[in-house]
Structure formats: structure tokens, C-alpha cells
Amino acid sequence: ECKWYLGTCSKDGDCCKHLQCHSNYE
């Protein structure tokens, strides 16, 4: 699951591919 630790990113989003998400990736 691609989910932000302190965000509202979901696995359906492309945020997992963003470096910002990787930093807050749970």
C-alpha cells in the first residue's frame, strides 16, 4: 500500500512515485 504517514496519499495515486512520498512513505 502506498500511503502517506502525514498526508492523504492513497495507493491509487501516483504520489508513491514522488520523492516527497518516499520521504513520508509508511
Curated annotation (Swiss-Prot):
UniProt entry keywords in alphabetical sequence: Disulfide bond, Ion channel impairing toxin, Knottin, Secreted, Toxin
InterPro entries with a match to the protein in the record: Huwentoxin-1
Q: Name one GO molecular function term.
A: toxin activity
Cysteine-cysteine disulfides: 2-16, 9-21
Q: What is known of its domains?
A: The presence of a 'disulfide through disulfide knot' structurally defines this protein as a knottin.
| Family of the protein in this entry | Belongs to the neurotoxin 10 (Hwtx-1) family. 17 (Hntx-9) subfamily.
Provide the function of this protein: Ion channel inhibitor.
Q: What is this protein called?
A: Hainantoxin F1-31.97
Species of origin reads Cyriopagopus hainanus
